[in-house]
């Protein structure tokens, strides 16, 4: 009975982390799209999001709202690859949104579970169960079918989105490893990630030519209240998304985090068709998205069965969020 009582909070946290990440991820796609439609400097937006994250956690530590540790150089060196892959993923994802409509962007990003599954085998995590492997393959097949029905096909945009998939795979695998091996909490990983991102992003906005034009345009745009509201919402949701993503990856796994991204795509895709338009609906497009969703549901069922068959392990990450 004591073991059962211990397992229940862990299962609850796992579910809350997954659902929270799904909601935040879905909202962030639309918010980023809304910002970029009015302000095309995606690297500057990403820099502002990371700066806001660093400042919030720093002052949160000073005021005693979180027990996250300060910057340690040895840990920073170990997490530097996470930061590089994370920012490369977001940078390519933001850039791809300029040429890819939201439903197809979501479909392409649904290739990430397959990439994570393959990387897990290559990095020695062992072979997945047959049901998990088949459900992930079904999800990837849905992406291909949906792409065949996309009449607004943008080769460059697709290339950027696929590159984003690679970088997302790498940083999720590294985050899962860092949480398991180094005992870092989601807030600590988020703090290191945002802090280490700032020099990299500062150089990037200069090299890409965004700065200083992006700054002058930003100041001019901020005088327009609707844009200012969307920008602030983007900064807040960037923090929420990072926290829920890292928490979900540590509490669950990198593969589960990507599958949550697949399941939240149902709502994102529907809203993308209705609200933002720019999509010529075709039977292949719709069929592919349905297959995507079926693969995600199948995966969820397979992992549920797998978790019931194994004792759930307690996560040290929970202690980091207690005052």
UniProtKB/Swiss-Prot annotation:
<feature type="topological domain" description="Cytoplasmic">
    <location>
        <begin position="302"/>
        <end position="323"/>
    </location>
</feature>
<dbReference type="GO" id="GO:0080147">
    <property type="term" value="P:root hair cell development"/>
</dbReference>
<dbReference type="Pfam" id="PF03151">
    <property type="entry name" value="TPT"/>
</dbReference>
<feature type="transmembrane region" description="Helical">
    <location>
        <begin position="253"/>
        <end position="275"/>
    </location>
</feature>
<feature type="topological domain" description="Cytoplasmic">
    <location>
        <begin position="59"/>
        <end position="78"/>
    </location>
</feature>
<protein>
    <recommendedName>
        <fullName>UDP-galactose/UDP-glucose transporter 7</fullName>
    </recommendedName>
</protein>
<keyword id="KW-0333">Golgi apparatus</keyword>
<dbReference type="GO" id="GO:0005459">
    <property type="term" value="F:UDP-galactose transmembrane transporter activity"/>
</dbReference>
<feature type="transmembrane region" description="Helical">
    <location>
        <begin position="279"/>
        <end position="301"/>
    </location>
</feature>
<feature type="transmembrane region" description="Helical">
    <location>
        <begin position="187"/>
        <end position="207"/>
    </location>
</feature>
<feature type="topological domain" description="Cytoplasmic">
    <location>
        <begin position="125"/>
        <end position="132"/>
    </location>
</feature>
<feature type="transmembrane region" description="Helical">
    <location>
        <begin position="11"/>
        <end position="31"/>
    </location>
</feature>
<dbReference type="GO" id="GO:0015786">
    <property type="term" value="P:UDP-glucose transmembrane transport"/>
</dbReference>
<feature type="transmembrane region" description="Helical">
    <location>
        <begin position="79"/>
        <end position="97"/>
    </location>
</feature>
<keyword id="KW-0762">Sugar transport</keyword>
<dbReference type="InterPro" id="IPR050186">
    <property type="entry name" value="TPT_transporter"/>
</dbReference>
<feature type="topological domain" description="Cytoplasmic">
    <location>
        <begin position="1"/>
        <end position="10"/>
    </location>
</feature>
<feature type="transmembrane region" description="Helical">
    <location>
        <begin position="36"/>
        <end position="58"/>
    </location>
</feature>
<feature type="topological domain" description="Lumenal">
    <location>
        <begin position="98"/>
        <end position="101"/>
    </location>
</feature>
<feature type="topological domain" description="Cytoplasmic">
    <location>
        <begin position="248"/>
        <end position="252"/>
    </location>
</feature>
<dbReference type="InterPro" id="IPR004853">
    <property type="entry name" value="Sugar_P_trans_dom"/>
</dbReference>
<feature type="topological domain" description="Lumenal">
    <location>
        <begin position="32"/>
        <end position="35"/>
    </location>
</feature>
<feature type="transmembrane region" description="Helical">
    <location>
        <begin position="102"/>
        <end position="124"/>
    </location>
</feature>
<feature type="topological domain" description="Lumenal">
    <location>
        <position position="154"/>
    </location>
</feature>
<dbReference type="GO" id="GO:0000139">
    <property type="term" value="C:Golgi membrane"/>
</dbReference>
<dbReference type="GO" id="GO:0072334">
    <property type="term" value="P:UDP-galactose transmembrane transport"/>
</dbReference>
<feature type="topological domain" description="Lumenal">
    <location>
        <begin position="208"/>
        <end position="226"/>
    </location>
</feature>
<dbReference type="GO" id="GO:0048527">
    <property type="term" value="P:lateral root development"/>
</dbReference>
<feature type="transmembrane region" description="Helical">
    <location>
        <begin position="133"/>
        <end position="153"/>
    </location>
</feature>
<keyword id="KW-0813">Transport</keyword>
<comment type="function">
    <text>Nucleotide-sugar transporter that transports UDP-glucose and UDP-galactose. Plays a role in lateral root and root hair development.</text>
</comment>
<keyword id="KW-1133">Transmembrane helix</keyword>
<feature type="transmembrane region" description="Helical">
    <location>
        <begin position="227"/>
        <end position="247"/>
    </location>
</feature>
<comment type="similarity">
    <text>Belongs to the TPT transporter family. UGnT (TC 2.A.7.15) subfamily.</text>
</comment>
<keyword id="KW-0472">Membrane</keyword>
<feature type="transmembrane region" description="Helical">
    <location>
        <begin position="155"/>
        <end position="175"/>
    </location>
</feature>
<feature type="topological domain" description="Cytoplasmic">
    <location>
        <begin position="176"/>
        <end position="186"/>
    </location>
</feature>
<keyword id="KW-0812">Transmembrane</keyword>
<feature type="topological domain" description="Lumenal">
    <location>
        <begin position="276"/>
        <end position="278"/>
    </location>
</feature>
<dbReference type="GO" id="GO:0005460">
    <property type="term" value="F:UDP-glucose transmembrane transporter activity"/>
</dbReference>
<dbReference type="GO" id="GO:0005794">
    <property type="term" value="C:Golgi apparatus"/>
</dbReference>
């Amino acid at each position: 009975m004591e073991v059962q009582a211990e397992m229940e909070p862990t299962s609850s946290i796992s579910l809350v982390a997954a659902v929270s990440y799904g909601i935040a991820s879905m909202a962030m796609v639309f918010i980023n799209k809304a910002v970029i439609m009015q302000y095309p400097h995606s690297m500057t937006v990403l820099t502002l999001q990371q700066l806001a994250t660093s400042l919030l956690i720093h002052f949160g530590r000073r005021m005693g709202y979180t027990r996250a540790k300060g910057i340690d150089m040895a840990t920073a060196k170990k997490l530097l690859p996470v930061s590089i892959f994370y920012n490369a993923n977001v940078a390519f994802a933001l850039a791809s949104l300029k040429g890819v409509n939201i439903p197809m962007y979501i479909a392409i990003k649904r290739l990430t579970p397959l990439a994570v599954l393959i990387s897990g085998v290559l990095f020695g995590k062992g072979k997945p169960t047959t049901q998990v492997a088949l459900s992930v393959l079904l999800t990837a097949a849905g992406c291909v079918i949906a792409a065949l029905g996309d009449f607004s096909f943008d080769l460059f945009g697709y290339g950027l989105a696929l590159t984003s998939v690679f970088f997302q795979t790498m940083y999720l695998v590294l985050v899962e490893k860092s949480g398991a091996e180094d005992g870092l909490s989601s807030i600590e990983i988020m703090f290191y990630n945002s802090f280490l991102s700032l020099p990299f992003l500062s150089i990037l906005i200069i090299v890409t030519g965004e700065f200083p034009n992006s700054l002058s345009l930003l100041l001019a745009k901020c005088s327009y209240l609707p844009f200012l509201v969307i920008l602030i919402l983007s900064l807040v949701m960037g923090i929420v998304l990072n926290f829920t993503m890292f928490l979900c990856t540590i509490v669950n796994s990198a593969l589960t985090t990507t599958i949550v991204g697949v399941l939240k795509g149902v709502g994102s895709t529907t809203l993308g068709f209705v609200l933002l338009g720019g999509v010529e609906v075709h039977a292949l497009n719709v069929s592919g998205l349905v297959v995507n969703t079926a693969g995600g549901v199948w995966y969820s069922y397979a992992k549920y069965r797998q978790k019931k068959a194994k004792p759930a392990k307690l996560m040290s990450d929970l202690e980091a969020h207690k005052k």
